[in-house]
């Protein structure tokens, strides 16, 4: 089946009353009158019909009903070449996109059209991008940990199954590699899949991610069905309508895997701030009065309509990892502040750790999780995590003294604390499966129980006599002894 998003039809078969024509174009915003009583519903997809009955060329989404059978719609692609008087067709449904296994290994735009030059998507399954959040009765309210196999995350800032995680990190600190490892691990440990939504970011970054996924095996070009991820891109150069809706397109694909295939799904949104930014642009184009700092008055509603659909149900779960850009590092800005209200955990990547060669460069002190409570994770996990944080915090406090006076000026207790902290810091590094082809080291998936055991043994002094190099880029604590003997 050839897929142009839900609009494969004979133009002649469309009811004449469902046709309108363009009377005004302001950038990506179109005004279209329809016959009396035939105005389309909010969020319906409209298609601008080109001259000479050629292919429909621009898809729009109804945003406002202006009265007198006139609607205002926002285009999902460039409006270059459109003119007043062009025919517009009401499809009668919201934008609908392909879903299911055939989406794996492919790249889509906001309309669900493949943009990877690998041919059409063979599927009859389409879902509208607008739908309600799951009803309360279908939600799974149990607080359970989503084990990632990544030591520093599982121990110090565990993810909630069906929760939302904010990923903070600048360029070059390992964000992409961490994302790919999470995609790989969920596929192996849970038989789950991932959906990546590129919202308003650089086209080059999207291309780099795709190439790296092919190199690491996350996308299998020979057998696309064995790929572990579907990609949906609405990049910086696209109109605000596309950037505002591409997150919903990715979420719709993820919901199918959760609700129909009953799988655990990872949904990546990079960047959630761009979703808000695009909504702000659309709001201004529609003539709404701006709210605080120029943002749209519907900011909380738009964010909630996206975030509330990301949840666990009795069928499966969607766990979302969202890159968060903080404008001017101002955490009180309405965009990040509204996002934080929905997050269960934060994973902060540290440039100083990356500079030391410690990967993943997750900052153990700045990363947080609402799940790290004794009644949720258990007393042993909580106690170990707190002791690790206290040790690392003390080491951080002593670093200025060490830089000026050296280790010899510290007390015996502080020297021991520093030695153990450096071993923990290195033990929390880990070789990744997706980096095997670059590093030559086989990847390691480490269970939470093994991580807790390893940190407990280091803190108890069991390995005080081993060099700290033995703890670098290993999996379980048992590998430390073997590595120390080889060295």
UniProtKB/Swiss-Prot annotation:
ATP binds at residues 169-176. InterPro entries: AAA+_ATPase, ATP-synt_VA_C, ATP_synth_F1_bsu, ATPase_a/bsu_AS, ATPase_alpha/beta_chains, ATPase_F1/V1/A1_a/bsu_N, ATPase_F1/V1/A1_a/bsu_N_sf, ATPase_F1/V1/A1_a/bsu_nucl-bd. One of its GO terms (biological process) is proton motive force-driven mitochondrial ATP synthesis. It catalyses: ATP + H2O + 4 H(+)(in) = ADP + phosphate + 5 H(+)(out). It holds the Pfam family ATP-synt_ab_N. It is a peripheral membrane protein. Its EC number is 7.1.2.2. One of its GO terms (cellular component) is chloroplast thylakoid membrane. It is found in: Plastid membrane. GO terms for molecular function: ATP binding; ATP hydrolysis activity; proton-transporting ATP synthase activity, rotational mechanism. Keywords: ATP synthesis, ATP-binding, CF(1), Hydrogen ion transport, Ion transport, Membrane, Nucleotide-binding, Plastid, Translocase, Transport. CDD domains: ATP-synt_F1_beta_C, ATP-synt_F1_beta_N, F1-ATPase_beta_CD. F-type ATPases have 2 components, CF(1) - the catalytic core - and CF(0) - the membrane proton channel. CF(1) has five subunits: alpha(3), beta(3), gamma(1), delta(1), epsilon(1). CF(0) has four main subunits: a(1), b(1), b'(1) and c(9-12). Belongs to the ATPase alpha/beta chains family. Produces ATP from ADP in the presence of a proton gradient across the membrane. The catalytic sites are hosted primarily by the beta subunits. NCBIfam families: atpD. This is ATP synthase subunit beta, plastid. It comes from Cuscuta pentagona. The gene is atpB.
């Amino acid at each position: 089946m050839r897929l142009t998003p839900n609009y494969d039809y004979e133009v002649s078969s469309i009811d004449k009353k469902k046709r309108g024509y363009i009377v005004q174009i302001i950038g990506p915003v179109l005004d279209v009158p329809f016959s009396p009583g035939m105005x389309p519903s909010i969020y319906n997809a409209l298609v601008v019909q080109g001259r000479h009955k050629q292919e429909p060329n621009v898809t729009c989404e109804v945003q406002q009903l202006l009265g007198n059978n006139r609607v205002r719609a926002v285009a999902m692609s460039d409006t270059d070449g459109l003119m007043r008087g062009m025919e517009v067709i009401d499809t009668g449904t919201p934008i609908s996109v392909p879903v299911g296994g055939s989406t794996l290994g492919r790249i889509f735009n906001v309309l669900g059209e493949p943009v990877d030059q690998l041919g059409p998507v063979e599927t009859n399954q389409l879902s509208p991008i607008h739908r309600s959040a799951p009803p309360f009765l279908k939600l799974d309210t149990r607080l359970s940990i989503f084990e990632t196999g990544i030591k520093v995350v599982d121990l110090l800032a565990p993810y909630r199954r069906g929760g939302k995680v904010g990923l903070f990190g600048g360029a070059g600190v390992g964000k992409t590699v961490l994302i790919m490892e999470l995609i790989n691990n969920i596929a192996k440990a849970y038989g789950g899949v991932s959906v990546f939504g590129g919202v308003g970011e650089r086209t080059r970054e999207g291309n780099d991610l795709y190439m790296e996924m092919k190199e690491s095996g996350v996308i299998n070009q020979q057998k696309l069905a064995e790929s572990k991820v579907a990609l949906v891109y609405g990049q910086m150069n696209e109109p605000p309508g596309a950037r505002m809706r591409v997150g919903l397109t990715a979420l719709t694909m993820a919901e199918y895997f959760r609700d129909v295939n009953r799988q655990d799904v990872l949904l990546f949104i990079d960047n959630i701030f761009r979703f808000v930014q695009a909504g702000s642009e659309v709001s201004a184009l529609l003539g709404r009065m701006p709210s605080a700092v120029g943002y749209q008055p519907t900011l909380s509603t738009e964010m909630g309509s996206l975030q509330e659909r990301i949840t666990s149900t009795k069928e499966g779960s969607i766990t979302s990892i969202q890159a968060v850009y903080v404008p001017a590092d101002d955490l009180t800005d309405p965009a990040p502040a509204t996002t934080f209200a929905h997050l269960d955990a934060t994973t902060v990547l540290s440039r100083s750790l990356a500079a030391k060669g410690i990967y993943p460069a997750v900052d153990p002190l700045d990363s947080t999780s609402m799940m790290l409570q004794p009644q949720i994770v258990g007393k042993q996990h909580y106690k170990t995590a707190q002791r690790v944080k206290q040790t690392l915090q003390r080491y951080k406090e002593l670093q200025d003294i060490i830089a000026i006076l050296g280790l010899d000026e510290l007390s015996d207790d502080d020297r021991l604390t520093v030695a153990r902290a450096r071993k923990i810091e290195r033990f929390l590094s880990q070789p990744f499966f997706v980096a095997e082809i670059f590093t030559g080291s086989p990847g390691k998936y480490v269970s939470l129980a093994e991580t807790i055991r390893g940190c407990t043994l280091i803190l108890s002094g069991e390995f005080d006599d081993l060099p700290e190099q033995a703890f670098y880029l290993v999996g379980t604590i048992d590998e430390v002894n073997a590595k120390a003997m080889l060295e």
